[in-house]
Each structure stands twice: as C-alpha cells, then as structure tokens.
C-alpha cells in the first residue's frame, strides 16, 4: 500500500518573522504495491509565474510567497527529511518584469539554488519561443520532463525527456510530465517545430514502462493540463486518472486551483491522488508517503 498524507504550506509574512502554516487535509490509501515501509516527502509547486518577490498589497494572498521565503521553507523541510524530492508542474515563467527582462534566467537560477529535482513545462515557458527556452534550460540542474511534446529536431532535444527516475535510498520514483495542448495558448511560431501528442496515450505508455519495466515504487505525473473535467472535451487530470493505470499521484497546474486531496479511481479501481497549489507561489504542497 502507498499511504499518503497531504498538506499545504501557506507562506505568510508576519511582523517579525515568516510563519509556516501547515493544514492537514486527510489520510487515504493510493496504489497497491506491497513492500516494506519506506517514507518519502514530496514538495511541489506550480504556476509561480515569475513571482520572485512576495505578492503585493491588494492582491489575493498579499505578502505571501516569494523565492526567499520558499527557499527558507525548503531548507527547513530538508532538515526534517534530507531525502525529500522537489517538483514543479510548470508555468514558472511570465507574470512579472523579471521574466520580461531576463526571459526565465532568474527563475531557473533560483530553482537550481532551491534544489529542484524535476519540472514539466507550462504554456508560458514558450512565450519567447523554443530556442530561447532551450538556452535558458541549458543551465538547469534539474530534469525537465514532458512525455507528450515531441521535441525531436528542436533545440530542446536532449534537454526535455519523457521521464526521469529519482532514487532515494531503496526507493525508485518515476516522474513524467504532460503539457497542455498549445493550440490557442502558444503562438505557432513559438511552439514550432515541436509536436503535441495525445496525453492519455503518452501517459499510459510511460506509466507502464516506469511501473512494470523500470520497477518504480511510485509513479508521479507532473501535469500542466488542469485538474477538473470540463464540458469542452479539454484534457484534464481527472479524466487522465480515470482512463489510465499505474499512476499514483498527479501534481497539477495551469488552472490555478487549490486542489486539496482529490482522489479519483483509475481503470483498476485504485485511488490516484490529485493535487494543485493555486498560483503565484503563495503555497507549497507537501505529500508524505509511506510505501
């Protein structure tokens, strides 16, 4: 069994110090992989949108977030669990002048310093085109994963890969990414020569590979599709979970929603945990797993 407790850290500014508020949401079971107990801490973010500094007064979650506070929280968590993994589900770019002037260099440098393990790509990562994105990601010290963007023949080839396997002690954690359909979100010239692939088929192929052939104890999808099913037939994490197997956790993004421990049954009737932490870096998600 994979036992998961999920929390949110809401990063708030007080007069004298930053206070980290953890909200316990619930405790449930996901997956069905028998093994002796191991513990894993997963910290995750999404849709930071270049919010390097705390949010301004007058905005929702004013004075929350900011890279310095995030870095402090991550360091605090690493003292509790040095083996934690740190993930991002995309759209770390666009939204403040930091991105307008530096095109993502500030964000990637900060994520290197924070020790991210893997990220996937959001639509705003392409706002200055594939070549600019590739130049920025050349300096990344973390894996960039996306299983449904074919990057063959582009400057992202060799930088973006379908999945990665993170090792922590005896644990093997498979992490793969899914990008949103760029149509209507990304200018064609900024996405070319990449090809968008169907997310469900791509996800199932990679999940089967990770679980069955690569013998991963846990399979995590970093998805930039949006969490909830919708009447427009647009791909979502909820639909993905229902239509696949061998995925244990989907960490979502794109729709800027607070998704608090949503469990969806997959094709085999096993529970898949869906999470998303809103936007602008006001919160960090924390998942504690026993396998």
Language model: regions and residue ranges:
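N-terminal amphipathic/basic-hydrophobic helices that include classical n-h-c signal peptides
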Residues: 1-11
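Leucine-biased recognition of intrinsically disordered, low-complexity hydrophobic segments
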Residues: 5, 20, 24-25
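Bacterial N-terminal signal peptides that target proteins for export
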Residues: 9-21
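Hydrophobic h-region of N-terminal signal peptides that target proteins for export
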Residues: 24-33
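Acidic, metal/ion-coordinating pockets
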Residues: 32-291
């Amino acid at each position: 069994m994979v036992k998961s407790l999920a929390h949110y850290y809401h990063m708030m500014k007080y007069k004298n110090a930053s206070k980290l508020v953890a909200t316990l949401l619930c405790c449930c079971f996901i997956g069905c992989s028998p093994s002796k107990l191991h513990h894993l801490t997963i910290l995750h973010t999404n849709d930071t949108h270049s919010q390097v500094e705390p949010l301004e007064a007058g905005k929702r979650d004013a004075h929350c977030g900011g890279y310095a506070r995030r870095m402090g929280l991550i360091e605090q968590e690493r003292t509790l669990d040095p083996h934690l993994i740190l993930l991002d589900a995309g759209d770390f770019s666009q939204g403040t002048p930091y991105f307008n002037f530096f095109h993502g260099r500030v964000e990637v440098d900060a994520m290197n310093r924070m020790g991210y393990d893997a990220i996937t790509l959001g639509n705003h990562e392409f706002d200055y085109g594939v070549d600019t994105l590739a130049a920025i990601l050349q300096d990344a010290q973390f894996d960039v994963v996306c299983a449904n963007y074919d990057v063959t023949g582009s400057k992202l080839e060799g930088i973006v890969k379908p999945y990665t396997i993170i090792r922590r002690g005896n644990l093997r954690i498979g992490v793969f990414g899914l990008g949103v359909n760029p149509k209507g979100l990304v200018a064609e010239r900024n996405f070319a020569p990449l090809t968008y692939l169907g997310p469900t088929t791509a996800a199932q192929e990679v999940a089967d590979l990770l679980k069955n052939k690569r013998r991963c104890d846990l399979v995590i999808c970093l998805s930039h599709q949006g969490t909830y099913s919708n009447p427009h037939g647009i791909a979502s994490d909820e639909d993905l979970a229902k239509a696949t197997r061998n995925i244990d956790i989907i960490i979502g993004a794109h729709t800027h929603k607070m998704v608090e421990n949503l469990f969806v049954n997959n094709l085999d009737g096993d529970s898949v945990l869906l999470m998303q932490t809103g936007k602008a870096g006001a919160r960090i998600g924390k998942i504690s797993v026993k396998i």
